[in-house]
């Protein structure tokens, strides 16, 4: 953690360090799934679907005269991100909600339909993401709906269904919640 190795040489990563990744559907030729250990390192997995027509029109026309990415402006500094992370950690999580998160995680581990349940890293991700959502909602505490709202995004990519079971990872986690 907090480092990367290239050709046997290890390099420390800056703080904060974030990765945003995209993934093509598995049906695409040349697309391979990541190993469980790598998937587990992503805080959330969000499916965005296709944009609506008006947004896609704006997207297309923004490419008329060059690359729009060249004109992006920073909205936060590294220090801003670190401060927001610190603030999010101060958001209160009642013991009953900690128990609720643990119950969800343990249900994935003891589910006959799942080959792999959620790791401790996944539990921490749901906990931290719930704190962040509460902060964005301008609350000083997490509520059950925060956990419910984020459970699929924080956990579904961390579970693996047994080969003979029907349903997606998303459906499996939704069934547990």
Language model segments and positions:
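C-terminal engagement/docking regions of AAA+ P-loop ATPases
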Residues: 110-177
């Amino acid at each position: 953690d907090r480092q990367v190795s290239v050709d046997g040489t290890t390099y420390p990563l800056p703080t904060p360090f974030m990765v945003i990744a995209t993934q093509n559907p598995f049906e695409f030729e040349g697309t391979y799934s990541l190993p469980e250990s790598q998937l587990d390192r992503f805080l959330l997995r969000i499916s965005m679907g296709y944009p609506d027509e008006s947004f896609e029109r704006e997207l297309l026309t923004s490419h008329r005269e060059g690359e729009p990415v060249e004109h992006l402006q920073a909205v936060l500094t590294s220090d801003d991100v670190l401060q927001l992370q610190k603030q999010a950690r101060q958001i209160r999580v009642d013991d009953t909600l900690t128990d609720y998160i643990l119950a969800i995680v343990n249900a994935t581990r003891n589910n006959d339909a799942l080959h792999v349940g959620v790791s401790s890293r996944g539990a921490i991700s749901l906990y931290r993401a719930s704190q962040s959502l509460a902060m964005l909602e301008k609350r000083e505490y997490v509520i059950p709906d925060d956990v419910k709202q984020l459970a699929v995004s924080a956990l579904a990519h961390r579970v693996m269904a047994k080969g003979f079971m029907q349903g997606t990872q998303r459906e499996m986690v939704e069934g547990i919640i």
